[in-house]
């Protein structure tokens, strides 16, 4: 469950929409519409936000462990993507044993013309023709690890999402969504 620092971010979002702060998401003795709404949206929104950008605070560099006895579907090698913390998105890939990294957004999106596919991902397994793989990836980190700008954007986005449910105000939700988008651009 979320850390105390994470509860602070959740409460900042709740207060933004006129709701009372909560002490915990773990209270199982009474059913609270606020806690239910937060639980329904929290993890989805956090993971979506983390995947949306290459955040410094969520980027991890690692060498992948090669797997054996795995169907490589025509590729030479198979590697397990990180599980703890979970790899949400591979953002950079090294073809030279970690000496230099290729930014995948630049490689696939910003250069004109067809590009060689460097790897494929199937069920949390990275398939490629590189003998030793190093990646930089966006990890599913705890909210307490967010830097200040990302935390601020998250609070605004959570408030916007919750505004549709808790005060049930489309107008407030639309305003908060615009505010969240501005904060996201700054982050």
Residue ranges: model-predicted function:
Residues 1-187:
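Glycine-enriched, solvent-exposed interface loops adjoining structured elements
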